[in-house]
């Protein structure tokens, strides 16, 4: 017989999801971004149950299962293939390697500074394992409105979403991602924003 050529470990993988703004099905995918115990493939601890570690990763977290954000986080954090079955390896992006050690996104709505370490800054992608990066596109006005979560404001820039508005509040924990399942369609456009953050991609809201 013949031996198959190993897959290249340096390949980058992307998922681009487009919708009119709000999903209306009954998904079942589990809880992945709000777990209390998780070590990423490079040895970095995402969750160990301590308040200190939770504080570093608040922008990614919620307490709701079965969301797009859960799927995006799992696709990013869980290796797509076993590293030993690949030839070569993936390196973090150049943008990540050149990024500052910390970034201050200004103050949240309560006046608290929103500061993220480079590794936990969704602007950059530190992953060095086979993973999926998720980009989301919301193609209607519904993608930028969430009447069920009136305390959350979108960023100034929409194409792609920027890092002001309520983003600093998500960083500090002054705001939490709403219940995308129980809250129904009035809040689900926010799942597109959350999924892009969890998947280390960007959210584009276009009309």
Describe each region flagged by the PLM.
Residues 1-207:
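P/S/T/G-enriched low-complexity
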